[in-house]
Amino acid sequence: MESGPRVEPGPGAPAAVLARIPQEPRPSPEGDPSPPPPPTPMSALVPDTPPDTPPALKTATNPKQLPLEPGNPTGQISPQPAPPQEECPSSEAKSRGPTPTATGPREAKPSRRSSQPSPTTVPASDSPPAKQDVKKAGERHKLAKERREERAKYLAAKKAVWLEKEEKAKALREKQLQERRRRLEEQRLKAEQRRAALEERQRQKLEKNKERYEAAIQRSVKKTWAEIRQQRWSWAGALHHSSPGRKTSGSRCSVSAVNLPKHVDSIINKRLSKSSATLWNSPSRNRSLQLSAWESSIVDRLMTPTLSFLARSRSAVTLPRNGRDQGRGSGPGRRPTRARAGASLAPGPHPDRTHPSAAVPVCPRSASASPLTPCSAPRSAHRCTPSGERPERRKPGAGGSPALARRRLEATPVQKKEKKDKERENEKEKSALARERNLKKRQSLPASIRPRLSTGSELSPKSKARPSSPSTTWHRPASPCPSPGPGHALPPKPPSPRGTTASPKGRVRRKEEAKESPSPSGPEDKNHRKSRAAEEKEPAAPASPAPSPVPSPTPAQPQKEQSSTQIPAETAVPAVPAAPTAPPTAAPSVTPSKPMAGTTDREEATRLLAEKRRQAREQREREEQERKLQAERDKRMREEQLAREAEARAEREAEARRREEQEAREKAQAEQEEQERLQKQKEEAEARSREEAERQRQEREKHFQKEEQERQERRKRLEEIMKRTRKSEAAETKKQDAKETAANNSGPDPVKAVETRPSGLQKDSMQKEELAPQEPQWSLPSKEMPGSLVNGLQPLPAHQENGFSPKGTAGDKSLGRTAEGLLPFAEAEAFLKKAVVQPPQVTEVL
């Protein structure tokens, strides 16, 4: 492809410029006598020539003949190679044979006018056709240049399209790669999110499990602390250091575990992690009782009653009443009291102890002194009795308990040991903290409560010490164990009018409680606990400004049972001070408990109790009525709902049935219509088939009639032909018969005549065979030829084999008739005569 435009000689170029165009020498006519080959056509050299190019422009051009370059100052034409598109045809032309190359416009004329021979060559510089050839060559160069430019444009456009496609493909690949990377990134992010969510769920699950475990541990710790506190009630008294009771008593009754020296903690942790009842009731009692003297003294002091129990008991006056009630009502349902705890120091295991399932020992502390350590006189005035009355004190409680004690002793050793191990471990961990808490709780209220409860009697220090125990309002309601022990510890009072009236009242109360309670054994303990809780809630208001009673672990009972257990305990308060044998020091102790005990009138208490019971009964009746009404409303609503659902279901079923029936009817109607349509189609098809059969039958009849008619016509023609043939044959036979008769008469041998006869018959049969293909109807048996074939047999050979006939002349005639050929245009009379005669002859032969 050229780098710049080419200058082409115009039509008016001078001859000098044209002469300077390099020309190749032509072969001389002398050197090469053979004429030059014809020039190669332009179409073979220039394939891109448009079809509408004139013939003058399609002459052969030399690839070396190029236009002038603009940079050539001399005006010479520089050779330039042709484009590759134009070389291929030239190579094809070269392969065909040597072709003369056009060297300039001088040779263009001879190549164009090769068909016209010219004797002389005209010079190019002088003749005007040379100028025309130069002009045409310029036009050809111009067209070639245009074609090259178009080709270049086409290639450029093609290359641009190809580059555009490449760019599009590259962009598509980039887009696909980006999309793939994006999807991979999204998948990775989703996987990370799922993994993070899974880790978060696992972490939350672990946290929940951890919280649940911690909550379970805390609950177990709280339960353990509750058990520890309930157990420590039996030996960890809450008496203050400066309590006058310790100074006046001078005995071990007021000693508390909190007031022990520091070196005793290890012994308490090891030996006294449980209550005294559990300790004395353990299976290894013989081994555990082998203590040193100092340890035995500690155990004895812990086993003795303390004044903290009086603070928890609310009043020293109510204790004998509850004690007598417990003493009379002790049985299988009653828990063992502290009175038997004193006897447990005797040899042999004491049977009446805390039930193993209670998980806590006997909470209350007996008011009596230990048998080893008798109490002093001031304390025995209101708690103890002389040693001579102790056997009488133990008898009422021990009357109905040996069987229960044996059952408990048989069922408890393993459970007690397990509970002992568990509590020992918990005690080792929490004993120090428990002592500090108990000490703080015991020392929190004495200063504010003591002035309110102070009196002028000798027991006023004890009265001050009673509310000082924080377990009165804080820990006592949480104890699952009743406190019937003081009643057994106090000595029985001598019979008195008021005492005797109080006992039946207690019996009546116990009977009512037994009637109201669902179970025979457990409800009494529950009633005692409820009565204690109710007593503490009511009197605690003047003593403590803001007490926080701990809820009882037992399920809450109705208000009627609480009131029934509360009121008789309050009414029994004034009964004890009026006893004649009661010490005079017990009388002032009633005064601080009166404002806390409620009403002192028995009738008023009975009336209040009846009123409360009536209100509770009315409340229950109202609640029951409301429950019934609500149940009726719910039942009615349910019934209405069920009725509506049933109606809706029935409507749906009826609608479904109607739809099914309608569908069945429509289906049956459609089937009937289909059957009718099929039947109609079948009938129409049958009618059409009958019509077609009738038409075919008629056509067959017509065809048969036509054939019959044609047969009749053929028979008539045949009869006519036979008539004409038989007429001539009859004449010949007559002549021949005459000759034979003459010969017979002359005496020739008849056998010879018979032998000579078949030759003529054979000749006639051959003629008949030649005529048979022309008339195929003759070979078939028909009514026209009764003598030719009868039942498929030809009678002629039978006559020939026999050699004679019954009538010689007739037989010869019959043989001659059947064997001879048919002759056209003969008379018909002889044939008719023969036809009439022939059937009898055949019958005779057969």
Swiss-Prot record:
InterPro entries: MAP7_domain-containing, MAP7_fam. GO terms for biological process: microtubule cytoskeleton organization. It is found in: Cytoplasm, Cytoskeleton, Spindle; Cytoplasm, Cytoskeleton; Cytoplasm, Cytoskeleton, Microtubule organizing center, Centrosome; Midbody. Residues 113-123, 460-471, 568-579 have a biased composition (Low complexity). Residues 132-153, 407-437, 523-539, 600-740 have a biased composition (Basic and acidic residues). Residues 130-224, 414-443, 599-740 form a coiled coil. Its main location: cytoplasm. The modification Phosphothreonine is found at residues 49, 53, 99, 120, 554, 818. Pfam families: MAP7 (PF05672). One of its GO terms (cellular component) is centrosome. Keywords: Coiled coil, Cytoplasm, Cytoskeleton, Isopeptide bond, Phosphoprotein, Ubl conjugation. The modification Phosphoserine is found at residues 95, 115, 118, 125, 127, 256, 275, 315, 368, 401, 444, 448, 454, 460, 479, 496, 544, 548, 552. The keyword Phosphoprotein applies. Residues 24-41, 479-497, 542-556 have a biased composition (Pro residues). Residues 1-153, 186-210, 318-816 are annotated as: Disordered. There is a cross-link at residue 462 (Glycyl lysine isopeptide (Lys-Gly) (interchain with G-Cter in SUMO2)). PANTHER family: MAP7 DOMAIN-CONTAINING PROTEIN 1, MICROTUBULE-ASSOCIATED PROTEIN. Belongs to the MAP7 family. Microtubule-stabilizing protein involved in the control of cell motility and neurite outgrowth. Facilitate microtubule stabilization through the maintenance of acetylated stable microtubules. This is MAP7 domain-containing protein 1. It comes from Mus musculus. The gene is Map7d1.
